[in-house]
Amino acid sequence: LGPYTKKDVVDFFSDYGSRFLGKRVVVARDTPAFIGNRIGIFSIQSLFHRVKALKMTVEEVDKLTGPVIGRPKSATFRTVDVVGLDTLVHVANGIKEHCPDDERHEVFQLPSFIEDMMQQNRLGSKTGEGFYKKVKKEDGSSEILTLDLETLTYRSAKKAQFETLEKTKAISDVADRFKVLCDGTDKAGQFYRAVFGDLFAYVAQRIGEITDTVYKIDDAMKAGF
């Protein structure tokens, strides 16, 4: 939606998308990356920076950002492998270039380990290796190796365990579970507070810039992801 967009044009496409295509239509303002990618790329870039600061592993992050918070099993790093690291980097660089006045502009700067992975062509599924790598063992069976974010070498996967996760096993409601996760006193709780506190603050700052209300941001994220 730009300053010269006619209301009847918006109404027509909103109605057409909803009735004939069966899609949820979200009206966004004409800004770089619109709603979904602006918020989504900030979220994952913020996570990348936090992961390094907290010295967390790929397994730990995917354990904390998958079904336990109502997201798919692919969680964070497996999703990046499927989408392609180069795609993510392209969008992040575009936002960084075209949103110079963003108060969190520095978040869109790529962490060094992402730059190194790009240089080594570790783009994910399309190149056969990314944050995960499937290899054949001597006995003919397959093993999924995990990238060590400190050394950028592959190793056997390690089981991620957190006291906070244990406390949520009996909680079926995701909203109730999320409250317990964010109250955790271990590294998992610290991770949730840092990552989602950052995300929610950023979303609040985008209201009025990328769309009119926070509800439209919710709609775009739910429909798009």
Per-segment meaning from a language model:
Residues 1-225:
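N-terminal glycine-rich phosphate-binding loop for ADP-containing cofactors
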